[in-house]
From Swiss-Prot:
Monooxygenase; part of the gene cluster that mediates the biosynthesis of the aspoquinolone mycotoxins. The role of asqM within the aspoquinolone pathway has still to be determined. The first step of the pathway is catalyzed by the nonribosomal peptide synthetase asqK that condenses anthranilic acid and O-methyl-L-tyrosine to produce 4'-methoxycyclopeptin. 4'-methoxycyclopeptin is then converted to 4'-methoxydehydrocyclopeptin by the ketoglutarate-dependent dioxygenase asqJ. AsqJ also converts its first product 4'-methoxydehydrocyclopeptin to 4'-methoxycyclopenin. It holds the Pfam family FAD_binding_3. Its EC number is 1.-.-.-. This is Monooxygenase asqM. Its cofactor is FAD. The gene is asqM. Belongs to the aromatic-ring hydroxylase family. Keywords: FAD, Flavoprotein, Monooxygenase, Oxidoreductase.
Length: 443
């Protein structure tokens, strides 16, 4: 029989991907020896009450993972106040689409999802405040074929570097994954061409009945002019407003892109630099509001109702607040997938970083983790049913076949999601985005 201590798994990252994998391994009827490494502090349960981004979990992806972890009843109790209604307008305020959803993609806040998953994992399985530095092949003969994980405790000012040997290291460590970096020739994230900023405010029906009606009860989006406004209902009557700006909203960048003759089907133009846009935008809410609402490169030509919403959002920020503009990154569409690396598996953004313009990121991440856990379970069944005297060795020998099977499924799904996301980004920030959206909605 394969003992728990015979085969060790390291999961690097405690986001939705890493925690889904840990939750599914915990729920397994088999005994898996795994440790989750996370550089941040353990989130306090009270953070569930802090407004944050909402995630719509797709039935065949994120919801399938929730059910696979045995958490569906608990999930139903913590769904977001944001409904599945989606309203899409153009910059004149004309409604292009208004749908109510069919219950197939329920919303949950990111904080609530993290807490839901955390509550299903034994506390001792997660090492908080632990920064993974790198991984290297283990160099002792008895650990041949295994990986050495080097890490340090970030909660202590001066702490020595520690090392541990693992049979399998799972990279769930996001966009700038150190585990992905250990794979030869694996690409680094590239700038998608889009930057964003986020604000939170309260829009009550009593105070702003017209705004409340325009926004609706779920997600509200305005597309056009190389920009996208997205507003989502959050907990406690809060509204989360995101402004997505493509670098080409700047006239100088548009001219440069036109001259480049870049084929956008292959991905973002390498000439795009997020600093061009970020350095043109102040962080002070009052100054930023003045620039965005009056300059032709930004929202000056948008309808008065939409500009009023933006004005309310900016004026709702505290006086000394800073509104930070951040770039959005993605992994290149080609080459993909990457070469298999012995003893390593990637899930979520570490494997397939994409922008949010198809809503697939967290769904693909959770589906990755579920599929990987199920491959490990199948491998465990084969191993424990073997009559061999060294089941751990058999498990290790057959591991690469299980990882390859996982990658065939995960990378096919991820490639489709990455390509769809890129097409949606191009559509959202095209010169005639509103017309194209209307055609898509009518088809």
């Amino acid at each position: 029989m394969l003992r728990q201590s015979d085969f060790k798994i390291a999961i690097v990252g405690a986001g939705p991907a890493g925690l889904t994998l840990a939750s599914r391994l915990t729920a397994s009827s088999h005994s898996f020896d795994f440790t989750v490494f996370e550089r941040r502090d353990k989130p306090d349960p009270s953070q569930v009450s802090v407004p944050c981004a909402n995630l719509d979990l797709h039935r065949e992806l994120g919801l399938r993972a929730i059910k696979g972890c045995g958490l569906y009843p608990q999930f139903l109790e913590v769904q977001s106040a944001c409904t599945e209604q989606t309203r899409i307008l153009d910059i004149t305020g004309t409604v292009l689409s208004d749908t109510t959803g069919d219950g197939e993609r329920p919303e949950i806040s990111r904080n609530a999802l993290i807490q839901l998953l955390l509550e299903s994992i034994p506390e001792e399985r997660i090492r908080w405040n632990t920064k993974v530095l790198d991984i290297t092949p283990a160099n002792c003969s008895r650990s041949k074929g295994k990986e050495c994980l080097r890490f340090t405790d970030t909660s202590i000012a001066t702490t020595p570097i520690s090392e541990e040997i693992y049979d399998l290291i799972v990279g769930a460590d996001g966009a700038w994954s150190r585990i992905r970096a250990a794979i030869p020739n694996a690409p680094k994230p590239i700038y998608s061409g889009v930057c964003y900023m986020t604000m939170y405010l309260r829009i009550s029906r009593e105070q702003y009945p017209d705004m409340d009606n325009m926004i609706g009860s779920g997600t509200f989006a305005v597309v056009g002019d190389n920009k996208l406004l997205l507003a989502q209902r959050a907990i406690h009557g809060t509204l989360r407003v995101c402004l997505f700006l493509h670098s080409k909203c700047l006239a100088a960048v548009r001219k440069e892109l036109l001259a480049s003759m870049h084929n956008h089907n292959t991905g973002p133009c390498p000439l795009l630099n997020p600093d061009d846009l970020i350095n043109s935008l102040p962080s002070n809410p009052k100054t930023l509001q003045e620039l965005l609402l009056t300059h032709d490169d930004f929202f000056a030509s948008w309808s008065e109702d939409i500009k009023r919403l933006l004005r309310i959002a900016f004026e709702s920020q505290v006086a000394d607040a800073e509104i930070i503009t951040r770039p959005m990154y993605m992994l290149p569409l080609v080459p993909y997938p990457y070469a298999h690396q012995r003893g390593i598996a990637l899930v979520g953004d570490a494997a397939s970083l994409m922008t949010p313009f198809a809503g697939r990121g967290v769904n693909v991440a959770m589906a990755d983790s579920l599929d990987l856990a199920e491959e490990l379970e199948r491998l465990h069944l084969v191993t424990v049913s073997s009559s061999a005297s060294t089941p751990a060795a058999i498990f290790a020998d057959k591991l690469e076949g299980a990882l390859s099977a996982y990658e065939r499924t995960a990378y096919t799904r991820a490639k489709d999601a990455m390509e769809l996301t890129w097409r949606n980004l191009c559509l959202s920030f095209s010169e005639k985005a509103s017309d194209l959206f209307a055609a898509v909605m009518a088809s």
